[in-house]
Amino acid sequence: MSELTTLARPYAVAVFKAAKEAGNIQEWADMLEFLKQVMADPLMQRAASDPKAGKDRFIAKFLDLCKGHVIPEGENFIRLLASNGRLGLVGTIADMFAEFRAEEEGYVDVDVITAYPLEESETTNLNALVEKWMSRKGRLHVTVDESLIAGVVLRAGGRVVDASVHGQLQRLAKRLSN
């Protein structure tokens, strides 16, 4: 994973800088998220890395497939990635772009996994906790995973807090087996 981050970072930094200067951060974010979804498909990954397929032909077909979702500046970006065999990095680039944007706008994206749906008061309390923990406002992305039994898992900015019963049981089992 860190190798992907190392390879993707220069692209993500350059794209974010260009988007910021052009004032079209939202358009870039939307396009990158779309490209991330397209490249998540295993068939697309294979096609992008197939040495038998001509790069120019692949790029033309890829751009045609993405028509309506790619901003004008994005076409050159896609051509650059595809020509350098780096189109598979677009998911990592999209994630890094989102992190840069969050930092620029003064918030942090937080993945919240709970054992049950949160009530509004719990979400408010969690937001306050995240703001104290990360020294920035949190934008919560809540998912429910009943296997946690109870509690919550928070993932933000490379940090993880596992306050779930499932996590506690796993840690206990690990200690007992050692």
From Swiss-Prot:
Coiled-coil region: none
Protein name as it appears in the record: ATP synthase subunit delta
Transmembrane segments: none
Localization in the cell: Cell inner membrane
Subunit (UniProt): F-type ATPases have 2 components, F(1) - the catalytic core - and F(0) - the membrane proton channel. F(1) has five subunits: alpha(3), beta(3), gamma(1), delta(1), epsilon(1). F(0) has three main subunits: a(1), b(2) and c(10-14). The alpha and beta chains form an alternating ring which encloses part of the gamma chain. F(1) is attached to F(0) by a central stalk formed by the gamma and epsilon chains, while a peripheral stalk is formed by the delta and b chains.
NCBIfam families, per the entry: ATP_synt_delta, PRK05758.2-2
GO molecular function terms noted in the UniProt entry: proton-transporting ATP synthase activity, rotational mechanism
A family per Pfam: OSCP
Swiss-Prot/TrEMBL keywords: ATP synthesis, Cell inner membrane, Cell membrane, CF(1), Hydrogen ion transport, Ion transport, Membrane, Transport
Function of the molecule: F(1)F(0) ATP synthase produces ATP from ADP in the presence of a proton or sodium gradient. F-type ATPases consist of two structural domains, F(1) containing the extramembraneous catalytic core and F(0) containing the membrane proton channel, linked together by a central stalk and a peripheral stalk. During catalysis, ATP synthesis in the catalytic domain of F(1) is coupled via a rotary mechanism of the central stalk subunits to proton translocation.
Membrane topology: Peripheral membrane protein
Chief localization: membrane
CC terms in the record's Gene Ontology section: plasma membrane; proton-transporting ATP synthase complex
